[in-house]
A protein has these predicted regions:
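Accessory N-terminal region flanking or inserted into the helicase ATPase core
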Residues: 1-26, 31, 35-36, 54-56, ...
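P-loop NTPase Walker
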Residues: 1-102, 202
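Short, polar/flexible loop-turn hinges at active-site or ligand-entry regions and domain interfaces
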Residues: 50-53, 75-82, 98-113, 128-134, ...
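Conserved RecA-like helicase ATPase core segment
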Residues: 101, 221-222, 226-308
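Coupling/switch/interface segments within P-loop NTPase motor domains and analogous charged loops
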Residues: 104-177, 427-473
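Walker B catalytic acidic pair
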Residues: 215
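Helicase P-loop NTPase motor core
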Residues: 269-272, 278-367
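Core RecA-like ATPase module of SF1/SF2 helicases and allied nucleic-acid translocases
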Residues: 344-489
Length: 489
């Protein structure tokens, strides 16, 4: 049984972990949510009685999944029986890959397109439908999602509503003809399979006796229905659902927090509702100010080292959009030079990532002495399921002891990917993949050319002909096109 030190967790966190029932955990900002999830997973892994069962953890991003898994491994816990990742990755691996033949549109195979492909398709359709008097953009078309009832389009601009609906329906008709699916269809087809084939639900409920869901406040209706279908079918299945309704930021994309009664109806489980109310990150002034923006009444208490810090809260109503960048530069320099705030403790937020993409690059040019992490920094970050993106993570990180576990896990993904696409003429372990990558030396200053030459050297070392594998070639072309497009911007 997994045990932890006396001061590793606070009483609220321990209560959530030790509870044997299904849990709805409302975790305020800075409350140690990730730490609680990490220890809960480790605890449940130690309780598994069969090597055929898995604990599954659904995270909102792949970065969150990597962080949690790495934390568990650092605790010395074996993660062989843990599956952790996004809901889309879960659906592809456990529902679509083994059962897609039961969907008429997918039974002869399918290709998964990425967000860059979707954008290119929609941009092309927008251009064909636009007129000099009625111009329609890609952003106008981001008003659709799939629910359990099918495609829903919610264009709020009356003058282009009808045309936008035509564009989106044409987009999905084109995907159907090409046997392609996007992230929305991944969810919809997965739901359809579970709805029409109860035996699939039964199989998955036997494999996954315990399901954890992180950031549940941004979960879509289809995602609730997919996980609910699995949980409802099992006899003794349990769920650990974590999030904060006050932090829901994807309502416009269909994400919303279900209340306890709704969750119980969808999953067929009874939940103990618990909370994490201690904020270790912010000052008391910031915590109090947050009360003005709450939509869900919960208790938050600042208890960290910075609880007495005299935060400055200001609202600039006069800066123009043309001068916004200059003002942000001024604020950054003021906080670093005058208030002695560490650069890695400064965060810039915006309503959408697109608002930050150009800004990030401009700030890098104007403040080269500081390191930035944000949209536009990693040109392939939006294509996390691409094989060459996964390989690039290994290529572009140092082979240091501190990164060994993470890079070894990435190498394991490479091995799994190669086997899943039918590359059986090689016999490589994750350690051998790492050794090959570490031994390749490329003398090239241009980033794009460096990666291309590294890819060529890697393929030669592992004896793979990319032109003989449709999957690798398709991902290679898509990866380089996306990379070139970002570098041109």
């Amino acid at each position: 049984m997994f045990v932890w030190g006396k001061n590793d967790l606070n009483p609220e966190q321990e209560k959530a972990i030790y509870n044997e029932n299904s849990i709805l955990l409302i975790a305020c900002p800075g409350s140690g949510k990730t730490r609680t999830i990490t220890y809960k997973i480790a605890y449940e892994l130690s309780k598994l009685e069969s090597n055929k069962q898995y604990i599954v953890a659904i995270t909102y991003t792949n970065r969150a999944a990597d962080e949690i898994k790495e934390r568990i491994e650092l605790l010395g816990v074996d993660t062989e029986q843990l599956w952790i990742g996004t809901i889309h990755s879960f659906c592809v691996e456990w529902i679509l890959k083994p059962y897609h033949m039961y969907i008429e549109e997918l039974r002869f195979g399918y290709d998964i397109i990425n967000t860059n492909d979707t954008e290119n398709y929609l941009v092309s359709l927008c251009a064909s439908y636009s007129t000099p008097k009625k111009k329609i953009t890609y952003w106008d078309c981001l008003c659709y999602c799939f629910t359990s009832e099918g495609l829903k389009i919610n264009c709020t601009k009356p003058t282009i509503k009808e045309t936008v609906e035509l564009i989106i329906r044409d987009y999905y008709q084109n995907l159907k003809e090409k046997h392609e699916i996007d992230y929305e269809l991944i969810l919809y087809y997965s739901y359809c399979l579970l709805k029409e084939n109860k035996s699939i639900c039964k199989t998955l409920s036997n494999i996954f006796p315990y399901i954890l869901i992180d950031e549940y406040q941004d979960t879509k209706e289809l995602q609730y229905m997919i996980l609910g279908a699995i949980l409802k079918t099992g006899k003794e299945n349990k769920a650990f659902i974590v999030g904060d309704p006050n932090q829901s930021i994807y309502g416009n994309l269909g994400g919303f927090p279900m209340d306890k009664a709704q969750l119980e109806n969808v999953t067929g489980l009874y939940y103990d509702e618990l909370s994490l109310s201690y904020n270790y990150r912010s000052s008391s002034l910031l915590v109090s100010y947050f009360d003005y923006f709450k939509t869900y009444a919960n208790k938050i208490e600042a208890v960290g080292k910075t609880k007495d810090y005299q935060s400055v809260i200001s609202y600039n109503k006069t800066v123009s959009v043309e001068d916004l960048e200059n003002e942000i530069v001024r604020v950054i320099k003021t906080n670093i030079d005058e208030y002695r705030i560490s650069p890695n403790e400064i965060c810039i937020l915006a309503p959408q990532w697109i608002h930050l993409s150009g800004l990030t690059r401009n700030l890098m040019a104007r403040l080269p002495q500081y390191s930035f992490d944000g949209p536009g920094m990693a040109p392939f970050a939006r294509d996390i399921d691409n094989f060459w993106y996964k390989l690039s993570r290994i290529i572009l990180t140092d082979s240091t002891p501190g990164l060994y576990i993470r890079r070894l896990r990435w190498a394991s993904e490479i091995v799994t990917n190669l086997l899943s696409i039918g590359v059986t003429n090689i016999d490589l372990s994750a350690k051998q993949i790492l050794y090959i990558c570490n031994s390749i030396s490329i003398n090239e200053q241009d980033g794009l050319e460096y990666l291309k030459k590294f890819f060529d050297a890697f393929l030669e070392r592992v004896n793979i002909d990319i032109n003989q594998n449709k999957y690798l070639k398709m991902h290679y072309d898509a990866f380089l096109i996306a990379l070139k497009n970002v570098l041109i911007v």
